[in-house]
Design a protein with these regions (language model features):
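Solvent-exposed, non-membrane alpha-helical residues enriched in polar/charged side chains
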Residues: 21, 25, 40-44, 64, ...
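Structured binding elements
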Residues: 96
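Active-site phosphate-binding strand-loop segment of PLP-dependent enzymes
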Residues: 107-196, 201-209
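N-terminal "arm"/small-domain region of PLP-dependent enzymes with the aminotransferase-like
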Residues: 1-30
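Structural motif of enzymes handling amino- and sulfur-group chemistry
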Residues: 17-24, 208-216, 224-231
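Phosphate-binding glycine-rich loop
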Residues: 32-77, 91-93, 101-103, 126, ...
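Hydrophobic residues in well-ordered beta-strands that form the structural core
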Residues: 74, 80, 101, 160-162, ...
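Conserved coil-to-alpha-helix start sites within the AMP-binding
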Residues: 84-89
Length: 231
Protein backbone atom coordinates (compact mmCIF):
# COMPACT_ATOMS: atom_id res chain seq x y z
CA UNK A 1 0.00 0.00 0.00
CA UNK A 2 1.63 3.23 -1.19
CA UNK A 3 -1.12 5.70 -0.36
CA UNK A 4 0.05 8.20 2.24
CA UNK A 5 -2.30 8.75 5.19
CA UNK A 6 -1.92 12.25 6.62
CA UNK A 7 -2.43 13.04 10.28
CA UNK A 8 -4.62 16.00 9.39
CA UNK A 9 -5.07 18.22 6.34
CA UNK A 10 -5.80 21.93 6.70
CA UNK A 11 -9.33 22.90 5.69
CA UNK A 12 -9.97 26.45 4.53
CA UNK A 13 -13.47 27.83 5.10
CA UNK A 14 -13.14 30.70 2.62
CA UNK A 15 -13.15 33.48 5.23
CA UNK A 16 -9.45 33.39 6.08
CA UNK A 17 -8.38 35.97 3.49
CA UNK A 18 -11.22 38.27 4.53
CA UNK A 19 -10.03 38.30 8.15
CA UNK A 20 -6.39 38.75 7.12
CA UNK A 21 -7.40 41.72 4.95
CA UNK A 22 -9.45 43.13 7.83
CA UNK A 23 -6.42 42.97 10.13
CA UNK A 24 -4.31 44.84 7.59
CA UNK A 25 -7.03 47.37 6.76
CA UNK A 26 -7.46 48.25 10.45
CA UNK A 27 -3.68 48.24 11.03
CA UNK A 28 -3.88 45.43 13.61
CA UNK A 29 -0.66 43.81 12.44
CA UNK A 30 0.78 43.65 15.96
CA UNK A 31 0.34 40.39 17.94
CA UNK A 32 -2.87 41.49 19.67
CA UNK A 33 -6.14 43.00 18.48
CA UNK A 34 -9.89 42.44 18.04
CA UNK A 35 -9.50 39.23 16.03
CA UNK A 36 -7.27 37.65 18.67
CA UNK A 37 -9.56 38.75 21.50
CA UNK A 38 -12.58 37.39 19.62
CA UNK A 39 -10.79 34.10 18.97
CA UNK A 40 -10.05 33.71 22.69
CA UNK A 41 -13.71 34.31 23.54
CA UNK A 42 -14.81 31.75 20.95
CA UNK A 43 -12.40 29.21 22.44
CA UNK A 44 -13.66 29.90 25.96
CA UNK A 45 -17.25 29.29 24.85
CA UNK A 46 -16.24 26.13 23.01
CA UNK A 47 -14.29 24.47 25.84
CA UNK A 48 -16.74 25.60 28.55
CA UNK A 49 -16.25 24.81 32.26
CA UNK A 50 -15.83 28.57 32.97
CA UNK A 51 -12.25 28.37 31.70
CA UNK A 52 -10.21 31.31 30.42
CA UNK A 53 -8.06 31.06 27.29
CA UNK A 54 -4.91 32.88 26.16
CA UNK A 55 -3.90 32.76 22.49
CA UNK A 56 -0.15 32.24 22.09
CA UNK A 57 2.49 31.85 19.40
CA UNK A 58 2.56 28.04 19.55
CA UNK A 59 1.47 25.00 21.52
CA UNK A 60 5.08 24.76 22.66
CA UNK A 61 4.79 28.25 24.14
CA UNK A 62 1.65 27.13 25.96
CA UNK A 63 3.52 24.22 27.58
CA UNK A 64 6.40 26.56 28.46
CA UNK A 65 4.24 29.21 30.15
CA UNK A 66 2.11 26.63 31.97
CA UNK A 67 5.27 25.11 33.46
CA UNK A 68 6.47 28.57 34.44
CA UNK A 69 3.14 29.33 36.12
CA UNK A 70 3.36 26.03 38.02
CA UNK A 71 6.66 27.17 39.50
CA UNK A 72 9.01 24.86 37.61
CA UNK A 73 12.61 25.96 38.19
CA UNK A 74 16.16 24.73 37.51
CA UNK A 75 16.79 21.44 39.29
CA UNK A 76 13.13 20.39 39.31
CA UNK A 77 11.70 17.33 37.59
CA UNK A 78 8.56 17.09 35.46
CA UNK A 79 6.82 13.83 34.52
CA UNK A 80 5.95 13.67 30.83
CA UNK A 81 4.56 11.10 28.43
CA UNK A 82 7.27 9.30 26.46
CA UNK A 83 5.27 8.66 23.27
CA UNK A 84 4.68 12.22 22.05
CA UNK A 85 6.09 14.99 19.90
CA UNK A 86 9.26 16.54 21.33
CA UNK A 87 7.47 19.84 22.05
CA UNK A 88 5.81 18.21 25.07
CA UNK A 89 9.19 17.93 26.80
CA UNK A 90 11.46 20.62 25.33
CA UNK A 91 9.97 23.47 27.42
CA UNK A 92 10.88 21.56 30.57
CA UNK A 93 14.54 21.90 29.64
CA UNK A 94 14.07 25.58 28.73
CA UNK A 95 13.43 26.17 32.44
CA UNK A 96 16.46 24.17 33.54
CA UNK A 97 14.34 21.29 34.78
CA UNK A 98 14.61 17.60 33.86
CA UNK A 99 11.93 15.61 32.02
CA UNK A 100 11.18 12.19 33.51
CA UNK A 101 9.53 10.08 30.83
CA UNK A 102 6.64 7.75 31.64
CA UNK A 103 5.76 4.93 29.23
CA UNK A 104 2.36 4.30 27.64
CA UNK A 105 -0.42 1.79 28.23
CA UNK A 106 -1.88 -0.32 25.42
CA UNK A 107 -5.47 0.96 25.38
CA UNK A 108 -4.89 4.60 24.40
CA UNK A 109 -1.10 4.68 23.76
CA UNK A 110 -0.96 7.47 26.34
CA UNK A 111 0.61 7.79 29.80
CA UNK A 112 0.18 4.68 31.94
CA UNK A 113 -1.33 5.66 35.34
CA UNK A 114 0.36 2.75 37.15
CA UNK A 115 3.78 3.62 35.71
CA UNK A 116 3.15 7.27 36.57
CA UNK A 117 2.70 6.44 40.24
CA UNK A 118 5.79 4.21 40.17
CA UNK A 119 7.78 7.09 38.70
CA UNK A 120 6.57 9.52 41.37
CA UNK A 121 7.53 7.12 44.17
CA UNK A 122 10.90 6.47 42.54
CA UNK A 123 11.75 10.18 42.19
CA UNK A 124 10.69 10.94 45.77
CA UNK A 125 12.81 8.06 47.07
CA UNK A 126 15.87 9.00 45.00
CA UNK A 127 15.74 12.81 45.21
CA UNK A 128 13.66 13.55 48.28
CA UNK A 129 11.54 15.87 46.11
CA UNK A 130 8.12 15.53 44.52
CA UNK A 131 8.03 16.22 40.76
CA UNK A 132 6.66 19.69 40.01
CA UNK A 133 4.16 18.82 37.27
CA UNK A 134 2.67 16.02 35.17
CA UNK A 135 2.22 16.39 31.39
CA UNK A 136 -0.09 13.72 29.91
CA UNK A 137 -0.78 13.90 26.17
CA UNK A 138 -3.87 13.26 24.04
CA UNK A 139 -1.91 11.47 21.33
CA UNK A 140 -3.64 11.58 17.92
CA UNK A 141 -6.67 13.09 19.68
CA UNK A 142 -7.22 10.04 21.91
CA UNK A 143 -8.09 10.94 25.52
CA UNK A 144 -5.64 9.59 28.06
CA UNK A 145 -6.98 7.78 31.15
CA UNK A 146 -8.16 10.98 32.75
CA UNK A 147 -9.73 9.64 35.95
CA UNK A 148 -6.73 7.49 36.86
CA UNK A 149 -4.11 10.13 36.02
CA UNK A 150 -5.97 12.81 37.97
CA UNK A 151 -6.37 10.49 40.96
CA UNK A 152 -2.61 9.86 41.05
CA UNK A 153 -1.88 13.58 40.69
CA UNK A 154 -4.29 14.43 43.51
CA UNK A 155 -2.71 11.86 45.84
CA UNK A 156 0.67 13.55 45.55
CA UNK A 157 -0.52 17.14 45.10
CA UNK A 158 1.08 17.54 41.66
CA UNK A 159 -0.49 19.92 39.10
CA UNK A 160 -1.43 18.48 35.72
CA UNK A 161 -0.72 20.29 32.45
CA UNK A 162 -2.80 18.57 29.78
CA UNK A 163 -1.13 18.51 26.38
CA UNK A 164 -4.27 18.49 24.25
CA UNK A 165 -2.43 19.90 21.22
CA UNK A 166 -3.70 16.99 19.11
CA UNK A 167 -6.95 16.63 21.05
CA UNK A 168 -8.84 19.86 20.37
CA UNK A 169 -12.54 18.95 20.35
CA UNK A 170 -12.06 15.50 21.89
CA UNK A 171 -14.20 14.80 24.92
CA UNK A 172 -13.87 12.52 27.91
CA UNK A 173 -17.11 11.72 29.73
CA UNK A 174 -18.73 14.62 27.88
CA UNK A 175 -16.10 17.16 28.89
CA UNK A 176 -13.49 18.77 26.64
CA UNK A 177 -9.89 17.65 26.92
CA UNK A 178 -7.71 20.42 28.27
CA UNK A 179 -10.20 21.33 31.00
CA UNK A 180 -9.36 18.60 33.53
CA UNK A 181 -5.89 19.72 34.62
CA UNK A 182 -4.70 23.01 36.05
CA UNK A 183 -3.78 24.08 32.51
CA UNK A 184 -4.63 22.75 29.06
CA UNK A 185 -2.47 23.13 25.96
CA UNK A 186 -3.89 23.64 22.45
CA UNK A 187 -2.07 23.86 19.12
CA UNK A 188 -3.20 25.42 15.84
CA UNK A 189 -0.28 24.28 13.73
CA UNK A 190 -1.03 23.29 10.14
CA UNK A 191 -1.52 19.61 11.00
CA UNK A 192 -4.01 20.15 13.84
CA UNK A 193 -7.82 20.01 13.99
CA UNK A 194 -8.09 23.73 13.30
CA UNK A 195 -5.20 25.88 12.14
CA UNK A 196 -4.00 29.46 12.24
CA UNK A 197 -0.99 28.27 10.21
CA UNK A 198 1.01 28.46 13.43
CA UNK A 199 -0.07 29.34 16.94
CA UNK A 200 -1.52 27.79 20.05
CA UNK A 201 -3.46 28.59 23.20
CA UNK A 202 -3.46 27.86 26.90
CA UNK A 203 -6.62 26.98 28.80
CA UNK A 204 -6.40 28.60 32.25
CA UNK A 205 -8.40 27.91 35.42
CA UNK A 206 -9.49 31.51 36.05
CA UNK A 207 -8.99 35.17 35.14
CA UNK A 208 -6.08 35.64 37.52
CA UNK A 209 -4.17 32.77 35.91
CA UNK A 210 -4.97 34.17 32.46
CA UNK A 211 -3.55 37.57 33.42
CA UNK A 212 -0.37 35.93 34.71
CA UNK A 213 0.09 34.01 31.46
CA UNK A 214 -0.59 37.13 29.36
CA UNK A 215 1.97 39.02 31.44
CA UNK A 216 4.61 36.40 30.65
CA UNK A 217 3.55 36.22 26.98
CA UNK A 218 3.94 39.97 26.48
CA UNK A 219 7.54 40.17 27.71
CA UNK A 220 6.47 40.84 31.32
CA UNK A 221 5.85 44.52 30.56
CA UNK A 222 3.91 46.50 33.14
CA UNK A 223 1.87 48.30 30.47
CA UNK A 224 0.30 45.00 29.42
CA UNK A 225 -0.30 43.97 33.03
CA UNK A 226 -2.26 47.21 33.51
CA UNK A 227 -4.14 46.76 30.23
CA UNK A 228 -5.31 43.26 31.12
CA UNK A 229 -6.62 44.05 34.60
CA UNK A 230 -10.09 44.48 33.11
CA UNK A 231 -10.16 41.04 31.47
Amino acid sequence: MNKRIYLCLAHMSGKEQMYIKEAFDTNWVVPLGPNVNGFEKDLEEFVGEDKHVVALSAGTAAVHLALLACGVKPGDEVLVQSFTFCASSHPITYLGATPVFVDSEVDTWNMDPALLEEAIKDRIEKTGKTPKAIVPVALYGMPYKVDEIMAVADRYGIPVIEDAAEGFGSRYDGRMLGTFGKYGVLSFNGNKMITTSGGGALICPDGEAKREIMFYATCSTSIFRQSFQSL
